[in-house]
A protein has these predicted regions:
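Structured C-terminal cap/extension of enzyme domains
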Residues: 104, 120-192
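Hydrophobic packing residues within well-ordered alpha-helices of enzyme cores
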Residues: 5-8, 94-97, 173-176
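Acidic-histidine catalytic/liganding microenvironments
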Residues: 12, 78, 157
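Glycine/proline-rich, positively charged
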Residues: 25-121, 127-134
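Active-site catalytic pocket residues across diverse enzymes, especially alpha/beta-hydrolases
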Residues: 9, 101, 180
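N-terminal binding-site loop/beta-alpha segment at the start of enzyme catalytic domains
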Residues: 1-16
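Hydrophobic/aromatic residues located in beta-strands of well-ordered beta-sheets
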Residues: 16-18, 84, 133, 163
Length: 192
């Protein structure tokens, strides 16, 4: 998808915030992935680069001296990336990331939606620590019929700074953008 985005955004890079991710856990792999992403995206700068789906068993490797975090820190110092984030699918991993590595990461991304609320307290803690929070799967992987209500729920949640609904067609892009433009608070009845 990076190659498609690179082609679509060519000449308009400054109008967008670019985020991407890598499964690399070691220094060499992450260094290589950053360079590949820059090339694929046809840019010299990525706004947010994320360690993707980081399980607890990989924390020591990723954040150790020879790990992916060092490569991202160097890329940030060189002006190749703006911010360093992590994504997680396990609540225990998210909690540890925020508590133990919160001074190193600038964003966390975790599944959060109207039916998956387990991350609420940890996302709130992340925000208290100044870590940006991103709602992954705000439409529960496409399983929610009332997408407008689902996106309004995220906007009213007070624990997510942004949500990234998956979109597979221009119509879905327009639909989700319309919710943002017409955003209204949830009523008491809707919250219940």
């Amino acid at each position: 998808s990076e190659e498609y985005l690179g082609a679509a955004l060519e000449g308009r890079r400054d109008s967008f915030i670019l985020a991407t991710k890598s499964m690399a856990r070691d220094y060499a792999g992450m260094s290589q992935d950053v360079e590949i992403s820059l090339s694929n995206l046809r840019t010299n700068y990525i706004d947010l680069y994320q360690l993707h789906n980081l399980p607890e068993k990989d924390f020591e490797l990723a954040f150790g001296g020879g790990g992916a975090y060092r490569a991202l820190s160097e890329a940030k110092a060189a002006g190749k990336i703006g911010h360093i984030g992590v994504t997680a699918h396990s609540l225990d991993a998210l909690k540890r990331l925020v508590e133990e590595y919160g001074d190193r990461i600038e964003t966390v991304m975790f599944p959060y939606n109207i039916v998956e609320l387990q991350g609420r307290e940890v996302l709130a803690l992340a925000r208290q620590k100044g870590i940006g929070t991103i709602a992954m799967k705000p439409l529960a992987g496409g399983n929610l019929e009332d997408w407008r209500l689902a996106l309004r729920f995220i906007a009213a949640s007070e624990v997510c700074d942004i949500s990234i609904p998956g979109m597979g067609s221009p119509e879905e892009v327009e639909r989700n953008a319309a919710v943002a433009e017409e955003l209204s608070p949830l009523t008491k009845e809707e919250l219940e």
